[in-house]
Amino acid sequence: MKVRASVKKICPECKVIRRKGVIRVICTNPKHKQRQR
C-alpha cells in the first residue's frame, strides 16, 4: 500500500474508489494498491 498525495491508475485493471472519504486505488496487482492522505 502506497500513501500518496495524488493517486493515479497505473494499469487498466486499477479502479479508483472512495471509501469513507478516503480515495483508494484497488487492483488485481497488489503493488498497485494506493491510498490518498
Curated annotation (Swiss-Prot):
<dbReference type="GO" id="GO:1990904">
    <property type="term" value="C:ribonucleoprotein complex"/>
</dbReference>
<dbReference type="InterPro" id="IPR000473">
    <property type="entry name" value="Ribosomal_bL36"/>
</dbReference>
<dbReference type="InterPro" id="IPR035977">
    <property type="entry name" value="Ribosomal_bL36_sp"/>
</dbReference>
<dbReference type="GO" id="GO:0005840">
    <property type="term" value="C:ribosome"/>
</dbReference>
<dbReference type="GO" id="GO:0006412">
    <property type="term" value="P:translation"/>
</dbReference>
<dbReference type="GO" id="GO:0003735">
    <property type="term" value="F:structural constituent of ribosome"/>
</dbReference>
<comment type="similarity">
    <text>Belongs to the bacterial ribosomal protein bL36 family.</text>
</comment>
<protein>
    <recommendedName>
        <fullName>Large ribosomal subunit protein bL36</fullName>
    </recommendedName>
</protein>
<keyword id="KW-0689">Ribosomal protein</keyword>
<dbReference type="GO" id="GO:0005737">
    <property type="term" value="C:cytoplasm"/>
</dbReference>
<keyword id="KW-0687">Ribonucleoprotein</keyword>
<dbReference type="Pfam" id="PF00444">
    <property type="entry name" value="Ribosomal_L36"/>
</dbReference>
